[in-house]
Amino acid sequence: MAGVKALVALSFSGAIGLTFLMLGCALEDYGVYWPLFVLIFHAISPIPHFIAKRATYDSDATSSACRELAYFFTTGIVVSAFGFPVILARVSVIKWGACGLVLAGNAVIFLTIQGFFLVFGRGDDFSWEQW
């Protein structure tokens, strides 16, 4: 039952993050949909972790080169997702208010992704690996 509560909480927080992102695009004062390209960063951010999890077999090791490279790529993706709306606002493609809403949405969505891996990545019987 605890896994179901966690799944509902993660779904709710993901919906809040996407709401911030959509508000940054769809409000009448902003009306520009360029910030939606951060959804690409949200979609590809877990991919390095998936690859590193499949490529490394020793779970006892504290660190491996493959896992560290996955952390590096994931960090680059997350920093790019936060930098993209700032660059768009800096060159006046979007307004700074829209940038703030997109950055708030990014923070909530990436914390939701991290929470998903913390809750469901333990390898127990209610794990995402079974899906």
Swiss-Prot record:
This is Leptin receptor gene-related protein. The keyword DNA repair does not apply. Negatively regulates leptin receptor (LEPR) cell surface expression, and thus decreases response to leptin/LEP. Negatively regulates growth hormone (GH) receptor cell surface expression in liver. May play a role in liver resistance to GH during periods of reduced nutrient availability. InterPro entries: Vps55/LEPROT (IPR007262). The keyword Ribonucleoprotein does not apply. Belongs to the OB-RGRP/VPS55 family. It comes from Bos taurus (Bovine). One of its GO terms (cellular component) is endosome membrane. Interacts with LEPR. Interacts with RAB13. It holds the Pfam family Vps55. It is a multi-pass membrane protein. The chain crosses the membrane at residues 7-27, 32-52, 69-89, 100-120. One of its GO terms (biological process) is late endosome to vacuole transport via multivesicular body sorting pathway. Keywords: Endosome, Golgi apparatus, Membrane, Transmembrane, Transmembrane helix. It is found in: Golgi apparatus membrane; Endosome membrane. PANTHER family: LEPTIN RECEPTOR GENE-RELATED PROTEIN (PTHR12050:SF3), LEPTIN RECEPTOR-RELATED (PTHR12050).
